[in-house]
Amino acid sequence: MAKLVGWGVIINVKAKASQNLDYRVTVDDLQNWEAQYGRIPNGAVVVMNSGWHHKYPNKTEVFGTESTTDPTTFHFPGFHENAAEWLVQNRNIHVIGVDTPSTDYGQSKTFPVHVILGRANIPGLENVANLDAIPEFGSLISVAVIKLQDGSGGPTRVFATLPPTNDCFMSTYLNIGLTFIALVISMFLTAD
């Protein structure tokens, strides 16, 4: 259960995915995120934001084909196996997620990202929604699962929490601090 909570790392590849339906998150994408925000934190939940979540519930758009029952025609972004392997070998992540139907891209035949994640016992989240509401850095993501026996997957409820804004945070703690000081002063004034 502890592996189902972690710092949110949102990898924004919307521009690249809009130009290439079969785009795959690369090691360069991950390193570019780190150049902007710092090292991916231990226990991170790394999620690709390709903008695909806006295509739901239109199956033709989600699967990138008119033949939504023929997997050989699927076109949607995912993680490149080198990026998944890099995360497994070099970062202590808890979860990988995508806003598409699979962590592997649509044209995958052997599903190497699934294999890499499974071998490392790292859950993969698919069809994650509302990613534009989460900052690329600074959220805490929790994955609530249902109990299944002998299942390889199932529905989840994924949610992100954000720290309070600095103004709100400071004002709350300033009020608490001033109240504490007032109580201490009143104790000294009333003491004989």
What are these regions (language model features)?
Residues I176-L189:
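Cleavable N-terminal signal peptides of Sec/SRP-targeted secreted and luminal proteins
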Residues M1-D167, S186-D192:
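Active-/binding-site microenvironments in catalytic and ligand-binding cores
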